Amino acid sequence: MVVDGKINNLNEIFAEGMKVREPQIVDMLLPNLEEEVINVSLVQKQSDAGEKSRFKAIVAVGNRDGYLGLGAGKAAQVRNAIEKAAADARLNITIIRRGCGSWECGCGQPHSMPFETVGKRGSVKVKIIPGPRGLGLVASEDAKLILKLAGVRDCW
């Protein structure tokens, strides 16, 4: 459908409730997509012959204008793990709502989050609070990298 020209952007795919099944679709619809490696670590599993080591990579992709995807991949070589993670991130791409949700600013431009956002996974809890224009990103380095790829410029 994408190659035929029936679908011209990712918003149409999400509006229809369809899923992206191939990473090449995202590359075609978002040509200015940037890719950042968040983490690469060595993981091991115990087998009957000993330990089997592999590399696990976590990659974030985004266009700095409201689209963001995160993915993980494992392989025997670092490069292959990064490639698998990048493909997984393209398949997991989503739209990030942006706006001016800070009571201090009120400019109406999409530089921050429109409201306070909380996410929890395991024992980790992440809370993103909208910030006024010019504040910057007050977060850890990994969180800054992910928020920049999503197009968020100001938040706590």
Specify the residue positions occupied by each region the protein language model found:
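Ribosome-associated RNA-binding proteins
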Residues: 1-156
